[in-house]
């Protein structure tokens, strides 16, 4: 994997994580408005985006674990940051939606 490929992989992770983040924030807004079916659906969609980002990341990690030297890329680090914070956001949003559901009862 050369530097350009690593940079493109970083952008791919940023894109998937960004899509997931947008869906999660939209899910929270839906829950605030009492539309729990939409909120749950958006969380599932976000999970699919996160899975795609994670798959891209896992491929890179497997290559490094097999001994391949991988070039450093600030874009990849940015992608890793986005993915990590989006995974955390998904956990927090899940709990917030559950609280909204309890409050609606």
UniProtKB/Swiss-Prot annotation:
The keyword Transmembrane does not apply. GO terms for cellular component: cytoplasm. Keywords: Cytoplasm, Magnesium, Metal-binding, Phosphoprotein, Phosphotransferase system, Plasmid, Sugar transport, Transferase, Transport. The keyword Electron transport does not apply. Induction: By lactose. The operon consists of lacABCDFEGX. A second transcript of only lacF and lacE is also lactose-induced. The PTS EIIA type-3 domain is phosphorylated by phospho-HPr on a histidyl residue. Then, it transfers the phosphoryl group to the PTS EIIB type-3 domain. This is PTS system lactose-specific EIIA component.
